[in-house]
UniProtKB/Swiss-Prot annotation:
Lineage: Bacteria, Pseudomonadati, Pseudomonadota, Gammaproteobacteria, Enterobacterales
Positions of transmembrane segments: none
Family of this protein: To E.coli K1 KpsD.
Protein species of origin: Escherichia coli
Pfam families for the chain: Poly_export, SLBB
Superkingdom classification of source: Bacteria
Keyword terms of this UniProt record: Capsule biogenesis/degradation, Periplasm, Signal, Transport
Localization per Swiss-Prot or TrEMBL: Periplasm
Signal sequence annotation: 1-20
Listed GO CC annotations: periplasmic space
Reported function: Involved in the translocation of the polysialic acid capsule across the outer membrane to the cell surface. May function as the periplasmic binding element of the PSA transport system, in which it transiently interacts with the membrane component of the transporter, binds polysaccharide and transports the polymer to a component in the outer membrane.
Entry's Gene Ontology molecular function annotations: polysaccharide transmembrane transporter activity
Name of protein: Polysialic acid transport protein KpsD
Amino acid sequence: MKLFKSILLIAACHAAQASATIDINADPNLTGAAPLTGILNGQKSDTQNMSGFDNTPPPAPPVVMSRMFGAQLFNGTSADSGATVGFNPDYILNPGDSIQVRLWGAFTFDGALQVDPKGNIFLPNVGPVKIAGVSNSQLNALVTSKVKEVYQSNVNVYASLLQAQPVKVYVTGFVRNPGLYGGVTSDSLLNYLIKAGGVDPERGSYVDIVVKRGNRVRSNVNLYDFLLNGKLGLSQFADGDTIIVGPRQHTFSVQGDVFNSYDFEFRESSIPVTEALSWARPKPGATHITIMRKQGLQKRSEYYPISSAPGRMLQNGDTLIVSTDRYAGTIQVRVEGAHSGEHAMVLPYGSTMRAVLEKVRPNSMSQMNAVQLYRPSVAQRQKEMLNLSLQKLEEASLSAQSSTKEEASLRMQEAQLISRFVAKARTVVPKGEVILNESNIDSVLLEDGDVINIPEKTSLVMVHGEVLFPNAVSWQKGMTTEDYIEKCGGLTQKSGNARIIVIRQNGARVNAEDVDSLKPGDEIMVLPKYESKNIEVTRGISTILYQLAVGAKVILSL
């Protein structure tokens, strides 16, 4: 008996130990804590050092793109550019260059020869060959002619530039990281600027870059020649050369209907507007320019057609705005639905619905007394108002106060439910339908992009929303709204005293209580009912449900 009790006691201890092992760890996905067993065993998180501090690097700040034209040269992966791989045929050979020479036939040789300080390479059995100052394209012919002086036949020659002389070049002035940078003599100016981090986009110049050798200026470089015309003079660098980026010169800004909306730099005190436009590249259809001048205490604006740009000048600090300024001469509308005529019509600006209805060719199924009009500008406005209502609803649900812990938990669940509802409602696209009045439909002004729909005759009544079986029911004279709902199984249990609206075929919205008789083509929409202790939330959801039903003919459930 004692043995049996001992076995039970040991088993109970093991079970308690197992349960303690299971419960000792918090869920890291919920708490963000490390497993407690790892801490007890002396294990450390990967992001912690020996002192217990978190070594996780902070996220990198977002890169702010400069508006300065030319700054894109030094953005992205181009900053990691290496030395030039290929060589320019016009490259002039210098002491320190490495030359690959191959001889085969009666005499063979294969080796890399370095140009000595006197400008020579030494070929076995041939002697010194002076190649310094010779272009890369003439190298093979020169070496061949020297070999032929010794071996007149049965010896073939191939010579090529293997590696240019390594050099160190100073990059200074208004660059991000001034200093001394290594490369080869054939590297371009851009290579060295990239190694220095590029031109400082806030202070440096893209049009005033000087390359000096000692006290002598070797070249003046304008990077706009490269950006706009693809021209960049290739100069060979030597040890100790200096690239100097000057300070920012005069600037003007371009905005509006252009392909290059940037701030541009120029060297002179003024620049022709025609040249500025050639840099900015106006989009097709641009008609006018606005010049905003900021000089002294005054700010002036000048407005001209683009055709009058010749002869006008921009000065330092000016802003050039390119715009499209033309009036609407005609409009285009689409006619869809049940008719036998054209589906697109071009009309004079200011035309009315009468001009369209006179050209429509109705057929036997056309319901001409229920013409529908859909307008993009109305749809956009409906979307804006819907988003505003959704924003207010979300704010009301998240700012609700609670007096007890249980009430706070319920409020949190309600806020999550409303957030999911708001996310679904934001995806709804309103139709932009304009409700037409039969008495003055002919005088309705049309806009470009309007869609006119001629509905088709039907004998059905649609029932949507909070009914057991949403369906289409055959129209029958004398049947009421309640009768059609009963045909679809009646209201759902959660609908209660739901709001019911009727949408006529011409787009008119009417409360079900105000409908005397239903017509073929009507739609019955039973809106869901939502109750909350927060009056603002209840009012907000009810408003949004109605907007969705009326504006998009959509019923969303929570």
